[in-house]
Regions:
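Residue-level recognition of single "structural anchor" positions
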Residues: 1-172
């Protein structure tokens, strides 16, 4: 998931781990360099920005508490190439499934006006649904808004508060 830090010239990455029961297991936030037409302007104005996407995912996966006696589990993600290497490194004995969202979109377009559209299975629905809920509940994540994150740590803290509320923790 991506967001911004004060301006589109300073994008952020948000690594999210979600269980099949929609429980948020962990979150990490990192910086990204600007992409496309904004990259030159971003370089001039703010200097080079590190791509912390892979580090955020690795830190998130390492922070997950997995019992040594736990049975095997399946790690599901989208098809970003760096995920395979990181998952294999952190969880060498676990199976990693990658899913291409583009295939699912094409199926939906083809079956738009038929009854079959409702039967299309999205294997990473839990993750996509939690990301949509995050964007809806945390206004600093909405795409076209003045409510932007000014500091990376504040965004991470806000997402942790959402995680606690989502998972049913009692806040004191």
């Amino acid at each position: 998931m991506e967001s911004i830090e004060h301006t589109k010239l300073k994008p952020l990455t948000i690594a999210l781990a979600v269980s099949e029961s929609y429980e948020l297991l962990g979150v990490q936030v990192g910086t990204l360099p600007a992409k496309g037409l904004l990259s030159d302007l971003s370089q001039k104005k703010y200097g080079p920005r590190l791509d912390q996407s892979s580090q955020a995912v690795e830190k998130l996966l390492r922070s997950l508490k997995v019992s040594p006696t736990a049975k095997s589990f399946i790690v599901k993600s989208d098809s970003k190439p760096s995920y395979q290497k990181i998952v294999a490194e952190v969880f060498p004995s676990q199976f990693h499934e990658t899913h291409i969202a583009r295939e699912n979109k094409e199926k939906r377009r083809e079956l738009k006006y038929t009854q079959l559209e409702k039967k299309i299975f999205d294997p990473i629905f839990a993750t996509n649904q939690r990301m949509a809920k995050l964007r809806d509940h945390i206004k600093r994540l909405t795409r076209r808004s003045w409510c932007t994150t000014k500091k990376l740590i504040n965004l991470e803290s806000h997402v942790y508060l959402f995680m606690a509320e989502n998972n049913g923790y009692t806040l004191i």
